[in-house]
Curated annotation (Swiss-Prot):
Chief location of this protein within or outside the cell: cytoplasm
Family: Belongs to the RNA methyltransferase TrmD family.
Protein name (record): tRNA (guanine-N(1)-)-methyltransferase
UniProt keyword annotation of Cytoplasm present: yes
């Protein structure tokens, strides 16, 4: 997979992309990440990438010309003629990024992320070049770079071979897409759209805090049952909105009814 990051602050990505899973995936040839400096596609001595908004108002807007020229230099086909390639603009007005979207993007051959700054990007970029706009949350950041780093990490870890253990992606929070991530039969650990269950490691006892006994006993059926219930509890407490779209068994629903009764 290829990922292109179009930005006026290329140095921003030196840290986030040079560590952990993203770094290992690049070294293994699973993903090729290229940072495109938008200022290289300007033609004045000040390397101007922004200008005042039409109609007045505060702030500056990223100009369309450098972005158009950047994509042309990358030989990105016109919108409508792209095969397994997407161009997305980071914007607070965009589609909310989630785990399902991360899986969708991980199946692309190429992903181009245009990082907005200031008051945003000239709308003609979205109207003509981009396949859509994407947002990482209902808040405003100084620019799209932080959001892009999040997207790159979330997408890269879903690429085949990026994680040491294929089960890791299936068991994580929000994995309603567990069946698609799984290469084999459905896993009993798959979260099915719930938040992740609690994790513990050695030592079993630390300063009086003890790992739950069920996790130490080695009964896999009981461990799975315990983990599922803890995931239900966490989701019920912290993100009840996720329960509407979660994959719930009759046992799950019965346990949730008990939680609701206890809460009331």
């Amino acid at each position: 997979m290829k990922i292109d990051l179009i930005t006026i602050f290329p140095e921003f990505f030196r840290g986030p992309l040079d560590h952990g899973i993203v770094s290992r995936a690049q070294k293994a040839g699973l993903v090729e990440i290229t940072i495109r400096d938008l200022r290289e596609f300007t033609h004045d001595r000040h390397r101007t990438v922004d200008d005042r908004p039409f109609g007045g108002g505060e702030g500056m807007v990223l100009k369309p010309e450098p972005i158009f020229e950047c994509l042309e230099a990358m030989e990105i086909p016109p919108r409508g003629n792209r095969e397994n390639v997407q161009v997305l603009v980071l914007s607070p007005q965009g589609r909310l990024f989630d785990q399902t979207m991360a899986l969708e993007l991980s199946k692309l051959d190429r992903l181009v992320l245009i990082n907005g700054r200031y008051e945003g990007v000239d709308e003609r970029v979205s109207e003509v070049l981009a396949d859509g706009e994407i947002s990482v949350g209902d808040f405003v950041l100084s620019g799209g770079e932080l959001g892009s780093a999040i997207i790159v990490d979330a997408v890269t870890r879903l690429l085949p071979g990026a994680l040491g253990n294929a089960d890791s992606a299936r068991q994580e929070s929000f994995t309603a897409v567990a069946k698609e991530i799984s290469e084999g039969p459905d896993s009993t650990c798959a979260s099915g759209g719930l938040l992740d269950y609690p994790h513990y490691t050695r030592p079993a006892e630390f300063r009086g805090y003890v790992v739950p006994q069920v996790l130490q006993d080695g009964n896999h059926a009981e461990i799975q049952r315990w983990r599922r219930r803890r995931a239900l509890e966490k989701t019920f407490k912290n993100r009840p909105d996720l329960l509407e779209g979660a994959e719930l068994s009759k046992e799950d629903q019965k346990y949730l009814a008990q939680l609701r009764a206890g809460k009331d």
